[in-house]
Amino acid sequence: MEDWTKVCQTVERVDDLPSEPRTRAGFLKYSQEITLDPNTAQRKLRLSEGNRKVTRMREDQLHPDHPDRFTDMFQVLSRESLTGRCYWEVEWRGRGVCVSVAYKSISRAGGRDAFGFNDKSWMLECFPNSYTFYHNNIESPVSGPQSSRIGVYVDHTAGILSFYSVSETMTLLHRVNTTFTEPLHAGINIYLIGNSAEFCKLR
């Protein structure tokens, strides 16, 4: 009887979790303002627009030494740590921009720091004609309408991470069901010089 009570309590807790929104208006109720942390930006990344936009540059930027800075990959993390239910959108430009979430404890160098190629990050790779999802060095092809705007929804408690193509409508590109063990941070990786990504103002 005691074990059955535990099962019932678990089911009740799962049932209590709110479902994922079904409309953009529903997602916007959980909109999260995202700013990028200059202390994590790789030296060839320039931040602008109040640290909401990141652009890959040819020359090193004047970033001071910091233990949180990515030294190899052209990556940056958000200043905000994300728990609970959050939604944000990224407008990207170019030919190779990665929209990611990661734990702050991700490595900053040494080949295991690339978003999507370790167990501490999840990445949607965006090209003009294709998407690919990566986690823990496993590649998953993604099909869906191409858009320069990607919506990201996180329900940290429920272990849900979803990526959406956003235009006049929202189309689910990829959903992850997992258990998050740390707060998450939004992340961007930019492959090519001149490419950029900007976190959109939704409020």
Residue map of PLM features:
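Beta-rich ligand-recognition domains in immune and ubiquitin systems
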Residues: 1-203
